[in-house]
């Protein structure tokens, strides 16, 4: 029988409780190497799907470090803690250490239900979960933790760590029109009721822009729902522009740690910013605002300049955080190097960015933006049609694609090329989408459950994550229309049916939410419901 006990003393509990303030919140294929850790004093194993099985003979517990190149606090942990000799020596002697780049190994991040980065997972020597937490601990505090872990681990043992929200779910046995109609209503009401009436934004903890969710609120529901959403979102985006927006170069930062939008995390992501630009143009269309137009235009210029590589012909994904640079005015910034723009391009991030930008160009009608979008589509298309399988990411310095793509890559690519086919009235893009969809069905579709499953996560893994990816694929298949065969039509209905009872989990999710990014997963599936219902009802008419 496993023994469960508290890992750390009361003082250490306080340290770990507040460490979240240092979290950066979610054929032959070349194997890419994660960034920076090769020179570390800590001897890290490179992550692979079988790294645990291959190293169990050592009998040591595992230290899994989830990190990201764009994350300020990840670099802080590496530079301030892992460079301490007694920490590195202890880890090397008593642990098998595994470094996991969360962008390359995104499915492993989902598998362990990690929250933010850096994120630490300790496994027992048998590979079972012992303890996990998010954030940065410094030298001696971290050393105390790893010593206690080393002394306490054992087969089946656990310690009280961060409690990751797990949504338990029994799939619907049959399709119910009532469930399909009630789910979006419950979602909209729950989200609208949880806007912060004093500081704005969703919830009363950390604050961020949620483009999918906010756009969905503006475009769905009753007239009264949309009017209420407009009021909340206008105030929310005004606060975002005041607090997490870069007025000099454009672009919005990833999120703010506090309810009142303080302590920004200064990473800039392409998909977040493309979605935010679309949101601002949409808000301005409904209720004109010079402030929104200025922020949207400036951020779009940032995307089409700083985050566009004209040599590669595609958009880049990330500009890393810098806690000093963004306090400088325009003149002083010219005297220093700007934060690095990452030279890796991830398939799903690029696809999500382009999906937004296609719609953005309907507002701005900019030939330059259209050319950049088309070139980026060609960049992805070349990988899809010339390679033997979808790849996870492209390394600009090596001009090589690395790692097999996961379900997220396939789903985002199918959805993108269906959108492109419709927008540009180009059947070739529909052919590309069909190619990726066929490969998705062969690689990820589970006939028993009737949904697409990421093997690393499993059908009983993160149900909200899988719901979103299934929602993207369902939307794309509906978009294929007459090009979809009878088998594809059956898959759509099975996917919609499987997740149709997820609305029952909403009350608990709304009650204790801290990070509201989970809503982004729901709206993808809800959009699929809307499309499915429209086609079903029209066919019956």
State each model region's role:
Residues 1-12:
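N-terminal secretory signal peptides that target proteins for export/translocation
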Residues 19-30:
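Bacterial N-terminal signal peptides
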Residues 31-38, 116, 150-541:
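Glycan-recognition and catalytic cores of secretory/periplasmic carbohydrate-active enzymes
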Residues 37-59, 176-180:
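Electrostatic cytochrome c docking/interface patches
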Residues 49-52, 85-131:
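Thioredoxin-like thiol-disulfide oxidoreductase module
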Residues 49-83:
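Local sequence-structure signature of Cys/Sec-based thiol-disulfide redox active-site neighborhoods
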Residues 69, 99-101, 266, 393:
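Catalytic cores of eukaryotic secretory-pathway lumenal/extracellular enzymes that build
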Residues 116, 122-156:
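Non-catalytic, surface beta->alpha helical segment in thiol-disulfide oxidoreductase systems
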